[in-house]
């Protein structure tokens, strides 16, 4: 089935990378039909939308593609569609303009009238059973039926200051979810965050059914992470006090997802960043299964490429400007 995923435009690359990583990690047979700023059209099994709804962070909606039409020919194209295949009980038509401009209100009424005449069903602008979503891209429409909305409620409610245990400097739940997805794990896999802090990354992984292991050198963070995980109903976890550089697990993990502390702080015992990262990579190699991925954040001023040796390969790299003096760089690194 052809489906359209409306992506967040908070970053030019991360949303698309996250989508494709989830599709691959879930073993879904898919192909990319079309991609652009704010969207991708893929061909995948129908059940795919349920997986994407549960996992994606940087996405808005998932829709079934009904057809394509020139911007000035949408009403004629709508006349050719058997709407009884797509509309049930009640419906609404709402145009989304990614690029370009049209008289949305007039077109929505026109298409709505066509559907109503074809099906005899009522229009419900408040809570429609079916939402028909024509998406304008330059001079054409992709005509879709919405299947799912990616809820933002969790990302608002799980912000660091709303958790039982809070400590400044924690990563946003949306970026944490994205990084877990970029690591290529799926439900049942096991991940490690050796700088777990307040547990934000582990929370997002645990909510997706991933088994989580966390470590931190600070007992306050260890206890706080346990409290936060339990608050979100996550039970399959292990959180231990350990220096990330000395950590040796009995069982290798499928991925490591982490946001190591920047610069010099108590949690790094005053060590310089380069030395900390180099020793962390030694530990990561011991704890990560062959072919497993590390998805980690680092400040732009750290030349991590110079610290990577033949044991690892950098697969992806994304920069996120945080403020004037800091850009966060997300890297996906494979253990070879």
Swiss-Prot record:
EC supergroup of this enzyme: transferase
Record localization: Cytoplasm
Domain (THUMP) ranges: 50-147
GO biological process terms on file: tRNA methylation
EC numbers, comma separated: 2.1.1.213
Catalytic activity: guanosine(10) in tRNA + 2 S-adenosyl-L-methionine = N(2)-dimethylguanosine(10) in tRNA + 2 S-adenosyl-L-homocysteine + 2 H(+)
CDD domains: AdoMet_MTases, THUMP_AdoMetMT
GO MF, one example: tRNA binding
Keywords carried by this UniProt record: Cytoplasm, Methyltransferase, RNA-binding, S-adenosyl-L-methionine, Transferase, tRNA processing, tRNA-binding
Entries under Gene3D superfamilies matching the protein: 3.30.2130.30, Vaccinia Virus protein VP39
Pfam families linked: THUMP, UPF0020
A single Gene Ontology CC term: cytoplasm
SMART domains cross-referenced by the UniProt entry: THUMP (SM00981)
UniProt record similarity statement: Belongs to the methyltransferase superfamily. Trm-G10 family.
Biological role: Catalyzes the adenosylmethionine-dependent methylation of the exocyclic amino group (N(2)) of guanosine at position 10 of various tRNAs. Acts via a two-step process that leads to the formation of either N(2)-monomethyl (m(2)G) or N(2)-dimethylguanosine (m(2)(2)G).
Complex formation: Monomer.
Matches recorded under NCBIfam families: TIGR01177 family methyltransferase
Protein name: tRNA (guanine(10)-N2)-dimethyltransferase
Lineage: Archaea, Methanobacteriati, Methanobacteriota, Methanomada group, Methanobacteria
Primary gene name: trmG10
